[in-house]
From Swiss-Prot:
UniProt name for this protein: Proteasome subunit alpha type-6
Lineage of origin: Eukaryota, Fungi, Dikarya, Ascomycota, Saccharomycotina
Sections of the chain in a coiled coil: none
Residues with Phosphoserine modification: 14
Superkingdom of origin organism: Eukaryota
Keyword Nucleus: yes
Originating species: Saccharomyces cerevisiae (strain ATCC 204508 / S288c) (Baker's yeast)
Chain's gene name: PRE5
Amino acid sequence: MFRNNYDGDTVTFSPTGRLFQVEYALEAIKQGSVTVGLRSNTHAVLVALKRNADELSSYQKKIIKCDEHMGLSLAGLAPDARVLSNYLRQQCNYSSLVFNRKLAVERAGHLLCDKAQKNTQSYGGRPYGVGLLIIGYDKSGAHLLEFQPSGNVTELYGTAIGARSQGAKTYLERTLDTFIKIDGNPDELIKAGVEAISQSLRDESLTVDNLSIAIVGKDTPFTIYDGEAVAKYI
């Protein structure tokens, strides 16, 4: 049986129970530049490598703020990430206006997954070709979620997505017992994230132009560092 008999849409299962279009969407994540997320009990951090198409273009935005307590980083198709981040921003505003409370981070992940899952079960759409790392802080503490276009969301202490992300993942696994205990010291958590992302680099080095950092936590609203603000972490 040929694979191309079953990969023309997202609603046809292969004889082995696979949805090939969804698997192809997961592969799109690996085309994006690497981004790292990690958290302790009090803070969560995103560290992302930005790319530019050529020497005459600006660097692509990799980290997006959704609310004062939440934001995300992307790997994959940036237009798809823009749609999802706008949706999440609307849900954050709705929660604040209607219920007078911040949207819980876990709830935000579930809302995104429900939106993504619809594109795996109906004609006329395609799966989102982007992976997201979502960080936030709510009454239950700091959170790090990984969103996949298959409709899965996972809460983690640390992970990396994008091209050559395995090096960063291996570093985080090796230092897990160290960085999860970094409470009340966000600079040390950021440095751990920068060291992790450097493990995924080959022919390039981190600079103030291609590095983007975000942090959120206890008494710390979601803040993005770009340009000279990241120099002290390199």
